[in-house]
Structure formats: structure tokens, C-alpha cells
Amino acid sequence: MEQISRIGMDTSKHIFQLHGVNTAEEPVLRKKLRRKEMFAFLEKLAPTVIAIEACGASHHCARLLQSFGHSVKLIAPQLVKPYIKRGKNDAADAEALCEAMSRPTMRFVPVKTAEQQAALMLVGVRDRLIRNRTQLTNAIRGYAGEFGLTAAKGKAHLDPLLERIQADESLPALARELFAAQAKEYAQLQAQIDKVDARLIA
């Protein structure tokens, strides 16, 4: 196979489209491969530079290609779009990636390590827990208001509200039971958030 100077690779869950050029900017590689075929092909290929669109699974793919000796460039999708010359499809996207990576002013996304991705996952878990806590807090306030129990906004005012609810014996038994379940859920969420915060600080 003629020497390849760089490759643009359009990725999906199962199919990968490769577009490679030589030093004269002539296309010398156009391949559509399944995942296993693609990794087997690139593992045997002489080290070259490969551009991939930055997306969810691109960092894992980039690390694997780096382990084969290739240099990997990740490019944000919006920076690739101007280089698509014809209708958007896998082959056009791969060619656009190959073209975009050659531009001297192109900005690349650093390839994240597995550890960096795990840390970002932890941040994502925290965000989801915070959203769940906010949703639950709003629900508790809304239900409490229906029984004439109100409190000022803010997380600091929720615990006193829960204490008032627990102490209010005029509430129907079912309402008291449901409020108790929500209070327990809130405490569990807060404990999870505290645990995640401790890991982020460590």
C-alpha cells in the first residue's frame, strides 16, 4: 500500500469510514470497515496521523489507536462541518476530517486518559444527584404547601420544614407516611452528594 500521510476516520457504533491521502494530497485509501476489521487494519498499518470527530466514544478509540503507534487528532464537529464538500455521509465526513486536520490553524481536542474520563463521570453523577435533589425538594415544598406548611426558598430552609411536617399531627396518616418517605429519600440523596463531593475534593 502506498505511504499514507494522514487519515480521516468517521466513526459510528459499528461502521467506520476511512479516507487517507499521501504526501501529494492524493487519495490513496477509501475503506468502510466494521469495528473489528477497522482495529485489525489500523493495528497493522504503519504509524500515521488519524483524525476523529470528538464525540462520546472518541477518546477510548483514540487511546486504542495511540497504543498501535498512531498519532490521533480529535476535532470538534462544528470545526469539521465547513470542510464537507458534498452531501453529508460517512465517506464525505471522513474526507472532511482528513482535510480539516491539515489546516495549520485547526484547534484539536486533547485526548483524555481513562482516569480523566472517570473524573468527568464523577462530575456528571454529581450533577444528576443535584438535579434529583432539586426536583425532590420542589415536590416536598409543593405538597407541604397544599397543607398550609410553607418555608422560604433555599436548601437551608428544607430541614426545618421537614421537622415541622413530622411534628404536625393534624396531617392525614397517609400524608405523614409519604412525607416521611420523601424525607428519607432526601437524606439518602444528600449523603450521596456529600460522598461524591468528598471524592472530588480528595
Q: At which residue positions do the language-model features occur?
A:
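A detector of single, family-specific signature residues
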Residues: 1-202
